[in-house]
Amino acid sequence: MNRVYKWYLRMHNSNYAFIRRFIEVMLHIIFSCDIPSEVKIGKNCKFAHNALGVVLHPKVVIGDNCSIGQNVTIGGRAGKTTVPVIGNNVLIGANALILGPVTIGDGAKIGAGAIVVKDVPPPATVIPEASRIIIEKA
């Protein structure tokens, strides 16, 4: 996946629009991911499980040495014009949502299933709220 994506990025900056679009469609079909070629991804970033289910906004910026789990969404929020900026050495767990004009600081860890709508300072850890059992009376 990483090699295919690097080739895809090279096509973005060339006159081979048909090939770039073909690769984009194949990434979507095979890996069910939506990673536009406009996304700025730093060096040595890794996507778990070949970026399965990952959705990124075209204007997202991801720093160096980040690790992103499967089914992660990083994008905007309704009514907001800016999108998330992810720092260096950030770990984002599976099924995490990072939405709106937020900045994730260097070295931060976003736990699996977390929903981030506020800035995360370096090197904070964000975890989702624990599950609760709700018993309804019959």
Named regions from a protein language model:
Residues 1-33, 131-132, 138:
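Terminal amphipathic alpha-helical/low-complexity segments used for targeting or macromolecular assembly
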Residues 12-13, 52, 94:
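Residues at structural and domain junctions
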Residues 74, 133-134:
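Short clusters of hydrophobic/aromatic residues that line enzyme substrate/ligand-binding pockets
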Residues 125, 134-135:
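Conserved protein kinase catalytic core
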